[in-house]
Amino acid sequence: MNINNIKIRNSKINDIEKILEIEHSSFARNICEDKQVFIDRINTFNKGFLVAEYDNEVIGYICSEIWIYDENLKESSFLLNHSIKEAHKNNGNELYISSFAVLPKFRKFGIGKILFNYLTDNINKLIKNPKSILLVVAENWSSARSIYINKGFQEVCILNSFFDYADIEPFKANGIVMRKLL
């Protein structure tokens, strides 16, 4: 695979089936978000919903929302399938990365890093005077957590039993909310 042939672009509605394929191949069923949630994300904040293409195939995505920075985070803000229509604020100052995945066969090539860096490096085009970037990562995803820590993110709170793996094994992982101040 030639990483130089990766194209990053804004998502389109006709990408939805491929986005869902990536979602379902990347996460346990109880963690996957609904089709309508992704459609709403595309329609509400298309500039913050990027896809990676390789040979004209969508192989990864990252989507985000703009929130108003709040020191006192509410667990309800992070619910799976929450409505971007209610959470997204065009006048906000915090970028929340709501979902991020790459097809399994294309992992380990740096595609996730390309998507993540493209979104975060262009934050000033998305938000006027950005204050921070926020995301949630499963406690058991230690390699992802270390990547975020190396990029300057800090753990700010724990969402108990946030990730439900019941369709794979009887296990729930805590979600770690991480924030990077800009």
PLM region descriptions:
Residues 5-19:
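A short beta-loop-alpha structural element at the N-terminal edge
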Residues 6, 57-61, 95:
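Glycine-rich phosphate/pyrophosphate-binding loop shared by adenosine-nucleotide-utilizing enzymes
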Residues 29-54, 58-69, 82-86:
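Active-site rim helix/loop that mediates acceptor-substrate recognition in acyltransferases
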Residues 63-99, 160-171:
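Conserved acyl-donor/pantetheine-binding loop and adjacent beta-alpha core of acyl/acetyltransferases
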Residues 95, 123-138:
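Conserved GNAT acetyl-CoA-binding A-motif
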Residues 102, 108-123, 150:
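Conserved acetyl-CoA-binding loop-helix of GNAT-fold acetyltransferases
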Residues 107, 133-145, 161-173:
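Conserved beta-strand-loop-alpha-helix junction that forms the acyl-donor binding cleft
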Residues 113, 125, 139-158:
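Conserved active-site alpha-helix within GNAT-family acetyltransferase domains
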